[in-house]
Amino acid sequence: MKIRRQKKILELVEQKVIRTQEELAEALKEAGFDVTQATVSRDIKELGLVKIPFQKDSYRYALPQKTVSAASIERLKRLFADAVSSYDQSENLIVIKTLPGAAQGVASAIDQVAFPEILGTIAGDDTILIIARDREQVPKILARFDEFLT
């Protein structure tokens, strides 16, 4: 549920002008999520959302810049520990199996960290396909994933 909710928060912040936690909580409730202000506050912190100037004397929530932060890596580690059940590789492809409904959240976290060895990710419901830049990069990627699970 948390992964879906946080994915929805990212969508809302990209698509709408969200100025306050209350507005975000209301938008989440309209989308079918039962949330408290404390939950919204924690999600904002975990996702690294920032407030940026909007119009005159106003601010809105926005996605953070595409820089790798310690928080992004910690979020990915938590998601791996909580949601990833296995992974394997073939040539320059890595397939990750997750709990049902978790693949898109994990793939988004991988994309946010922006590993230079990874060309891209494709996520379904419980499976992620990672395309490495070349097969020589795969051991390095898998070593990082191994660290996340220990």
Swiss-Prot record:
Record bears the keyword Transmembrane helix: no
Domain of life from the UniProt record: Bacteria
One GO cellular component term noted in the UniProt record for this chain: cytoplasm
One of the GO biological process terms: protein complex oligomerization
Pfam families registered for this protein in UniProt: Arg_repressor, Arg_repressor_C
UniProt GO molecular function: arginine binding; DNA binding; DNA-binding transcription factor activity
Record pathway: Amino-acid biosynthesis; L-arginine biosynthesis [regulation]
Keywords: Amino-acid biosynthesis, Arginine biosynthesis, Cytoplasm, DNA-binding, Repressor, Transcription, Transcription regulation
Compartmental location: Cytoplasm
InterPro entries: Arg_repress, Arg_repress_C, Arg_repress_C_sf, Arg_repress_DNA-bd, WH-like_DNA-bd_sf, WH_DNA-bd_sf
Role according to the record: Regulates arginine biosynthesis genes.
Entry's family note: Belongs to the ArgR family.
Protein's UniProt name: Arginine repressor
Chain's gene name: argR
